[in-house]
Regions:
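Multi-pass membrane glycosyltransferase architecture that uses lipid-linked
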Residues: 1-195, 228-368
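Periplasmic/ER-lumenal interhelical loops and adjacent helix-loop junctions
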Residues: 185-233
Length: 368
């Protein structure tokens, strides 16, 4: 890469990570040692790592072919997510399909694999297939940890409906699935398998995070270990506050809708908000947030962050671009829009899905 990917805003991780993750040849992630290099290797969860590995086998030792194989596979993931949303809410699924976030970030990284599994789990939740909800969330968490966050609102909804057995089934099936996927690799190659957790624990605050802004603009630099602990504490406190605030205004609100503020707060409080992480929010915007106005505001702000981020990276690499300050202003704008969306969700009556009743928050059920 020579910097044009930043100037033209057409960056993807797929091509450079073909080499960084050592996907040429027959190396098995976690099980075969990484060759010495200056970059991290095996830094993704099991399901994503082997998604990449399969794409590498299909494409041989050709980085360009590897990119196009991933384009096909990730497009299928996008189609699965869109199809699930169409079944849940036919009219609103078009929001996902036409979102600039999807168009720009679908091929930046492999997050759409986890998005597809999380959205399929959401469909299974509304069909009351709680065993499958857990299986799909477990698979999603084996691809990217964020789908595990859905266990909180989904189980809370079942408990609110006085169905503790379903909440337990959901949690246990998710845990069993995640363990079934991960345990063989942890047992056979613990050092390689643990690299994902080690890498993310040691990773410093990224350009897009509030922690980085505090350090860069206010000289309030927090050590990485303290950021990790503080982020968790802040997240627990903020989620609890949002939950209580919503319950005071609307005691019978659908608990599954907590998925939206939880995901937003994870992105705002965490130390990394990579561009493709915005894909996590799209299904929640489609299903939960009332009206298109705030969705359009988020899409505009996210587009501004995307363009100024890579323009700034172009400036860093010497091909020209906007200064860092413009990018940081756009970050603050997007954060403000997301906070506005969460406040609106707390203050306004909850949106009901087509056919959903206040006392029965499930689509016409298949017997579980």
């Amino acid at each position: 890469m020579d910097g044009r990917q930043y100037r033209l805003a057409c960056y993807t991780d797929i091509v450079p990570l073909f080499g960084t993750e050592q996907l040429a040849g027959g190396r098995l992630p976690y099980l075969d040692a990484c060759a010495p290099s200056g970059s991290n290797c095996d830094e993704y969860p099991v399901l994503t790592m082997y998604f990449m590995r399969v794409a590498g086998w299909i494409s041989g030792d050709h980085p360009e072919r590897f990119f196009w194989v991933n384009v096909i596979l990730l497009s299928l993931c996008a189609a699965v997510a869109a199809g699930c949303l169409y079944v849940i809410d036919t009219r609103r699924a078009i929001w996902f399909a036409l979102a600039p976030t999807l168009a720009l970030q679908v091929f930046v990284n492999w997050d759409l694999l986890a998005v597809a599994l999380a959205t399929a789990a959401t469909l299974a939740f509304f069909r009351r297939r709680d065993g499958w909800v857990g299986v799909l969330i477990g698979l999603g968490a084996a691809a990217k940890l964020y789908p595990a966050l859905l266990l909180i609102p989904f189980a809370a909804d079942r408990l609110r409906g006085r169905q503790p057995d379903r909440a337990i089934l959901l949690w246990w099936s998710a845990a069993a699935t995640w363990i079934a996927v991960n345990l063989p690799f942890a047992a056979a190659g613990l050092h390689g398998w643990w690299e994902f957790f080690r890498f993310n624990g040691a990773r410093p605050a990224d350009w897009d995070s509030a922690w980085y802004l505090l350090c860069h603009r206010l000289s309030l630099c927090v050590p990485t270990g303290l950021i990790n602990v503080s982020s968790i504490a802040l997240l627990v406190g903020l989620i609890s506050w949002v939950w209580m605030a919503k319950r005071r205004r609307e005691p019978d609100f659908p608990r599954w809708q907590l998925a939206f503020p939880i995901l937003v707060l994870v992105l705002l409080v965490g130390k990394v908000y990579s561009p493709q992480f915005s894909l996590w929010l799209l299904p929640s915007f489609v299903l939960i947030l009332p009206g298109p106005r705030r969705f359009l505001a988020f899409e505009a702000a996210d587009l501004a962050v995307f363009l100024t981020r890579f323009s700034f990276f172009g400036d860093l690499t010497g091909v020209g671009g906007l200064p860092q300050g413009v990018f940081e202003i756009m970050l603050l704008l997007r954060a403000g829009v997301l906070i506005w969306c969460v406040v609106a969700w707390v203050r306004e009556p909850s949106r009901r899905l087509p056919g959903e009743r206040a006392t029965d928050r499930a689509l016409p059920a298949a017997h579980a």
